[in-house]
């Protein structure tokens, strides 16, 4: 039964925002699973041939993980007003443990649906939400613990492996698949691509070491995994505020984020029309969407933290769960007894959610209602398969405050809540700092693994120094690469505007690319199977002066091309054996190639003579003067 509403009248949405895009020299391909509707996307980067004196030698295509959804598929028509295809709808329906509700369960959701003042903002193609049948649990963890491999788990296995095992027997990939041994620091990574099986995924989900955030009402989702024994993922933030940003901008920013590689998106909206903004984003997002429900609950009180109630928060959880939010940041570890521990901090409590709950606790002199009602929250989560992202409301806001009693006290409470959530078979990840100098990062990872039982860690950086406003994507990227290697499963990006203002599209791009670098560096360090393939391909292209391949194999082809063309814009420069840094006379790679070519061109007799002289020199004790 569908609910209809007038389409949004934003001019940019009416013109479809033109969100389709194509990556250079790339094709969109799909891996098919055990059933035809398990179609896992990947991007294949095509390479040009290597020119040699003997002719052209072809270079093979390079498969890469793809987060862009249908937006980069030339065969799919995108209509933002209709939303994306419901990839998971059939899987969910076949399981037979959910039911379509006759209407919305949330009081606030019903009010918004019937409010004529918001009709022009509303997403038009809404369907009634699903919920677990009475007594049922529909979480991926519940299925995994029952020994069931879901289509979502099979999808993840194919997505993580990229079917790289098929390349190992092909001679054209032999050199490209060489990889330095990693140091997984105790993690149980698969050793080879063929080890990334649906059963491996099931075991990781069942143990709680990984999650598949996949609300049953987010059928447009392309399933992915967050866990220490998978590829390191990154999250991008968006959201309107009371100061700036519009609904259309946020939809555009979501598509822009996944274009550059965001694995998940958090909608942190705090301004007008939070409900409508989230609906548009969800219906058009192929990646998991997370929120901080306390932000919207606070908005319902007019911004007065003391007026928050459990009933109001509960209604907000149900409202967002029925829209399809995949994971909730919930600051249930901010306990009354921890708040005084922040009094001597340099920057106090910097988490918005943490400060809201701290203020509520102090105003009422009661324990955090998110903590006291945690079991009831779990009942909601497992009815829709919403994952917990247990918030670090007492994270340090500067390196001076790192690793203090407030931070680690809350972390231990998050471990207690993790165990409680797992009794309900609810999926959990743990949020982490923040601002931590390099020498104190390892302690954060050790504490999380010990007290939170290896639940996936999800960190904001951390920023390793506080002296670089405007460059905090770099200060945090350094920490992110390190903690990613140590075991963090997902890295929350930081943009250059951190601490300064709301990021625009270019800031988002800069933050995502920075964090893609950090995540990939962590994968290399851990020894993720096949992680070095793209590095090797780009290095080979660089040595052979295949400029277009260098651009296209990079994380940001547009930026690389523009930097090259700033000094050598002519098309002929794209095949030149030098760049503007060294010029044609001093290029080390060009000189090395000339030396190789010279050695290869010498007659066999000359080579043999040089080898004989070399042996003679060694027999004489390698002395220059005798």
Swiss-Prot record:
Q: What class of enzyme is it?
A: lyase
- Looking at the Swiss-Prot or TrEMBL record, what is one Pfam family this protein matches? ThiC-associated
Q: Which GO terms describe its biological process?
A: thiamine biosynthetic process; thiamine diphosphate biosynthetic process
Q: Which pathway is this protein assigned to?
A: Cofactor biosynthesis; thiamine diphosphate biosynthesis
Enzyme Commission numbers on file: 4.1.99.17
Task: List residues binding Zn(2+).
Answer: 435, 499
User: By its UniProt entry, which NCBIfam families does this protein fall under?
Assistant: PRK09284.1 (NF006763), PRK13352.1 (NF009895), thiC (TIGR00190)
Q: How does it assemble?
A: Homodimer.
Name of the molecule in the record: Phosphomethylpyrimidine synthase
State the organism named in the record. Answer: Cupriavidus taiwanensis (strain DSM 17343 / BCRC 17206 / CCUG 44338 / CIP 107171 / LMG 19424 / R1)
């Amino acid at each position: 039964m569908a609910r209809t509403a007038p389409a949004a009248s934003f001019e940019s949405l009416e013109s479809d925002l033109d969100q389709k895009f194509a990556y250079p020299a790339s094709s969109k391909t799909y891996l098919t699973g055990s059933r035809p509707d398990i179609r896992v996307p990947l991007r294949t980067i095509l390479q040009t041939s290597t020119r040699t004196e003997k002719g052209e030698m072809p270079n093979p295509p390079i498969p890469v993980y793809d987060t862009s959804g249908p937006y980069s598929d030339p065969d799919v028509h995108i209509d933002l007003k209709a939303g994306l295809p419901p990839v998971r709808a059939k899987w969910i329906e076949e399981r037979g443990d959910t039911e379509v509700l006759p209407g919305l369960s949330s009081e606030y959701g019903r009010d918004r649906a019937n409010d004529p003042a918001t009709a022009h903002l509303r997403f038009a193609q809404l369907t009634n939400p699903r919920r677990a049948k009475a007594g049922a649990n529909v979480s991926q963890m519940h299925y995994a613990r029952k020994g069931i491999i879901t289509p979502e788990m099979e999808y993840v296995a194919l997505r993580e492996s990229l079917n790289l095992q098929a390349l190992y027997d092909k001679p054209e990939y032999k050199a490209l698949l060489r990889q330095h041994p990693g140091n997984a620091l105790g993690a149980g990574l698969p050793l080879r691509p063929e080890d990334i099986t649906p059963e491996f995924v099931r075991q990781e989900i069942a143990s709680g070491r990984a999650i598949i955030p996949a609300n049953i009402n987010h059928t447009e989702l392309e399933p992915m995994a967050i866990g220490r024994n998978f590829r390191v993922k990154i999250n991008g933030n968006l959201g309107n505020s009371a100061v700036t940003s519009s609904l259309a901008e946020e939809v555009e920013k979501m598509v822009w984020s996944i274009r550059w590689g965001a694995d998940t998106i958090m909608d942190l909206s705090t301004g007008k029309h939070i409900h409508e903004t989230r609906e548009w984003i969800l219906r058009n997002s192929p990646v998991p969407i997370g929120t901080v429900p306390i932000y919207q609950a606070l908005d319902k009180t007019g911004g007065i933290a003391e007026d928050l109630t459990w009933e109001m928060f509960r209604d907000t959880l149900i409202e967002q769960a029925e829209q399809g939010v995949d994971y909730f940041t919930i600051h249930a570890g901010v306990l009354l007894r921890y708040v005084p521990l922040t009094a001597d901090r340099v920057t106090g409590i910097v988490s918005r959610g943490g400060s809201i709950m701290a203020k509520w606790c102090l105003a009422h002199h009661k324990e955090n209602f998110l903590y006291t009602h945690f079991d009831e929250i779990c009942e909601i989560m497992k009815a829709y398969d919403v994952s917990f992202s247990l918030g670090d409301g007492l994270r340090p806001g500067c390196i001076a405050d790192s690793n203090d009693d407030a931070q680690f006290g809350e972390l231990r409470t998050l471990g207690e809540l993790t165990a409680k959530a797992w009794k309900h078979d609810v999926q959990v990840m743990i949020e982490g700092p923040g601002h931590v100098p390099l020498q104190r990062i390892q302690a954060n990872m050790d504490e999380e693994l010990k007290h939170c039982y290896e639940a996936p860690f999800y960190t904001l950086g951390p920023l390793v120094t506080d002296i670089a406003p405007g460059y905090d994507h770099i200060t945090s990227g350094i920490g992110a690469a390190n903690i990613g290697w140590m075991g963090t499963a997902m890295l929350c990006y930081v943009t250059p505007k951190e601490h300064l203002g709301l990021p625009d599209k270019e800031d988002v791009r800069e933050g995502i690319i920075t964090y893609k670098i950090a995540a990939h560096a962590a994968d290399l360090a851990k020894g993720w199977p096949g992680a070095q393939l793209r590095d090797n391909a780009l290095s080979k292209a660089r040595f052979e002066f295949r400029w277009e391949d260098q651009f296209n194999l990079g994380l940001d082809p547009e930026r690389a091309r523009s930097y090259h063309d700033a000094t050598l814009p002519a098309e002929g420069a794209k095949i030149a054996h030098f760049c503007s840094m060294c010029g044609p006379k001093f290029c080390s790679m060009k000189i090395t190639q000339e030396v190789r070519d010279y050695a290869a061109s010498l007659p066999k007799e000359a080579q043999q003579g040089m080898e004989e002289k070399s042996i003679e020199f060694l027999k004489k004790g390698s002395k220059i003067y005798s």
